[in-house]
From Swiss-Prot:
Listed PANTHER family: D,D-DIPEPTIDE TRANSPORT ATP-BINDING PROTEIN DDPF-RELATED, TRANSPORT ATP-BINDING PROTEIN
Organism: Agrobacterium fabrum (strain C58 / ATCC 33970) (Agrobacterium tumefaciens (strain C58))
Name the record gives this protein: Peptidoglycan transport ATP-binding protein YejF
Record-linked Pfam families: ABC_tran, oligo_HPY
Gene3D superfamilies: P-loop containing nucleotide triphosphate hydrolases (3.40.50.300)
Name of the gene encoding the protein in the UniProt record: yejF
């Protein structure tokens, strides 16, 4: 909690941030002020585009200067103004006294280096730890953030880890130097609910042990309620309300704060008709990845990412797939979509596709779409939003004129709640939540029959989550879409899924109608998942910890 009679560790005073492009200037942060005391957790909350991440990035001067500028303000850390600090002095602070966890792990991890090397570089640079000592410290950090069998992950590359595992590696890197201030920008966005709770507990323990302060940027008010000492509510670049968590949650003063507290996905999934045709079916699906060792790189074992799964999706039906990160849920979706090799039988709208090559799948791709977990990693930074969304139309609907394509793109953007005029802009100009909506628009513009939704709402604030759930329901009802909905957010799954598959270590733990499983889970593991999801507390049960 906040200490009294002491100076703030961080003091942001009258901070403004402006972006300049093509002669136009937009203000992203407008005269923001707040303090952060030693050992305190301050949450900066607001919807995507509110300016909270821009504020956080300003502290370490990570904005795209000179396109970005600060018309006003100071950022004092340990009495030093970060905005005027020389670059050499700033580098000494970055990654040492102040570390940062970003929202999208793939933007922070080097795809060419192993996990051991990336964590080891930090230990060598800041603590002069090398060799066996660095390896041991790396193993300790990976264990701390909940990565099972860390010895097997040391030589892994980022693309070989699940989204949640990548996020945990990034947290381990940030904690390696025991910083005074940790800036956490949606640090648990990609994590399943049980590990989310464990990571929050871990961060809380580290805060207590080392007197570490935290600036916690999030859209998840449930986390704020459990974890923060004070909260600052942002919208349109301004802080509109600040106070203790208890004050803001029990007696919100500003209309926008009341709007945030009231917004979350609600409602029931559309009715599923068992007489509707089967769109996608998988029987005994297996995806095994070989583990190689020795000079000859012989196969000594397998990671059984998916191990004998049966699944059926009908037109107008949503099957939710839930489980901890690394459980195999995304791998199952990729196998059904024929984006990775698998064993077992797969049929799509009556066609057996399990033996189809890449070329044979091409004519079906427009009807079989994917929305990925990490929007930044799936959107080309060199293409405008309009070009990104129109790309599939150029391949699959070549008869369309340029004007017809443009109309389809504009309609798709409107459907996901974005201004069609934004189609001339580029992905880096959007917030994380806006980028996710662009990814959804890109999939929907092709009018698919089957859509794999891999954490489609994970980067979205609560009110936009609710809008996207409503949008997905409307699109499903209109076009009889079959959704494979992969998520760790069981609140969203509850609002959207007709049927549920609970996965763990590549196998089905429990499956059936979603309403029945939510009301009366049969397996200990499912009970632990539900307890963590709806209470945001670390669940200490063998079902989760083993």
């Amino acid at each position: 909690m906040k200490e009294t009679n002491t100076q703030p560790l961080l003091s942001v005073r009258d901070l403004s941030v402006a972006f300049h492009q093509g002669g136009a200037t937009s203000v992203a942060v407008d005269h923001v002020s707040f303090d952060l005391m030693p050992g305190e957790v301050v949450a900066l909350v607001g919807e995507s585009g509110s300016g909270k991440s821009v504020t956080a990035n300003s502290i370490l001067k990570l904005l795209p200067y000179p396109a970005a500028s600060h018309p006003s303000g100071k950022i004092l850390f340990d009495g030093k103004d970060m905005l005027t600090l020389p670059e050499r002095a700033l580098r000494a602070v970055r990654g040492n006294d102040i570390t940062m966890i970003f929202q999208e792990p793939m933007t922070s991890l080097n795809p060419l280096h192993t996990i051991e090397r990336q964590i080891g570089e930090i230990l060598e640079l800041h603590q002069a730890i090398t060799g066996a000592e660095a390896r041991q410290r790396t193993l300790e950090l990976l264990l701390q953030v909940g990565i099972r069998e860390p010895e097997k992950r040391l030589k892994a590359y980022p693309h070989e880890l699940s989204g949640g595992q990548r996020q945990r590696v990034m947290i381990a890197m940030a904690l390696a130097n025991r910083p005074k201030l940790l800036i956490a920008d949606e640090p648990t966005t990609a994590l399943d609910v049980t590990v989310q709770a464990q990571i929050l507990e871990l961060l809380g323990d580290l805060k207590t042990q080392h007197g570490m302060s935290m600036l916690f940027i999030t859209h998840d008010l449930g986390i704020v309620r459990k974890f923060a000492d004070r909260v600052c509510v942002m919208t349109k670049g301004k802080i509109v309300e600040t106070g203790t968590v208890e004050q803001v949650f029990t007696d919100p003063q500003h209309a926008y704060t009341r709007h945030l507290l009231a917004a979350e996905p609600k409602g029931e999934p559309p009715h599923s008709d068992a007489s509707k045709p089967v769109v996608m079916q998988g029987d005994d699906i297996k995806v095994w990845f070989p583990i190689k060792a020795g000079l000859m790189r012989r196969v000594i074992d397998h990671v059984k990412a998916v191990d004998g799964i049966d699944i059926t999706l009908r037109a107008g039906q949503t099957v939710g797939v839930v489980g901890e990160s690394g459980s195999g849920k995304t791998t199952l979706g990729l196998a059904l979509s024929r984006l990775i090799a698998s064993k077992g039988r797969i049929s799509f709208i009556g066609q057996s596709i399990d033996s189809y090559s890449y070329e044979m799948m091409k004519p079906l791709r427009n009807r079989l779409q994917v929305v990925f977990q990490d929007p930044y990693g799936s959107l080309s930074p060199r293409m405008s939003v309009g070009e990104i969304i129109a790309e599939g139309l150029k391949v699959h609907e070549r008869s369309l004129s340029a004007d017809e394509r443009d109309t389809r793109v504009a309609t798709a953007l409107e459907e996901v709640g974005l201004d069609p005029a934004t189609r001339w802009r580029y992905p880096h100009e959007f917030s994380g939540g806006q980028r996710q909506r662009i990814a959804i628009a890109r999939a929907m513009v092709l009018k698919p029959r089957f859509v794999m939704l891999d954490e489609p709402t994970s980067a979205l604030d609560m009110s936009v989550q609710a809008q996207v759930v409503d949008l997905l329901r409307d699109l499903q009802a209109k076009h009889e879409l079959a959704y494979l909905f992969i998520s760790h957010d069981l609140r969203v799954v509850k609002a959207l899924a007709n049927d549920l598959i609970v996965m763990r270590h590549g196998k089905v733990v429990e499956s059936g109608p979603a309403a029945e499983i939510f009301a009366n889970p049969q397996q200990d593991y499912t009970k632990a998942l539900l307890a963590a999801a709806f209470n945001i507390e670390a669940v200490e049960t063998k079902a989760v910890s083993q």
